[in-house]
Amino acid sequence: MHDSPPVAQDIVERLKARNISVFNYHIPLDRVSPWSPGTNLAKALGVTPYEEFYEQNLVRMGLLCHTPFTTVTQFAQRVREVLGHEIRVYPYGDEQLIDGRIALMGGGASNPNIYAELREKGINLFLTGITWPEIPWVARNHAAAKEHGVTLVGGTHYSTEKFSPMEMVKFFEGLGLACEFIPETPRLQEL
């Protein structure tokens, strides 16, 4: 588990002076639920989850999904359209999707053991956020994906998770709270 540095007191004071509340909820939000990054990424892409996978910190975060697509190229085009920017495809598996199925997890999946599991479940494409192979833990994922014939599709950490906080806006508004989703610029170097 990683400890986050405390928020600097001057930032806290500036937020208080402007009556700004901050809500931060990470791993519990990552758990597959109506509010999770995976669920909302699947919804945005128009794919249908049928099973959860990838456990981290005692919660399941990834989804196996049925899609209307038959090829990596078709699915990648849909991802580009939905995310609104270029993506990166590492074609370690076949161009044909197995029965139109894919796996996805917003952000970044750090466990290289999932690629064997995905192939056992008949999946040959995994969409996630961070796929830049120069990061050591990502390099291990590339090796495992290549070994097991699973194509990696990278969409950036932010872009694969942004649909979750966008959905949370609706949740808070339903409670009568004014809130706003503030977009950021995707870090394309994560691809």
Which residues fall in each region the model found?
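Active-site catalytic microenvironments in core metabolic enzymes, especially phosphate/sugar-handling
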Residues: M1-L191
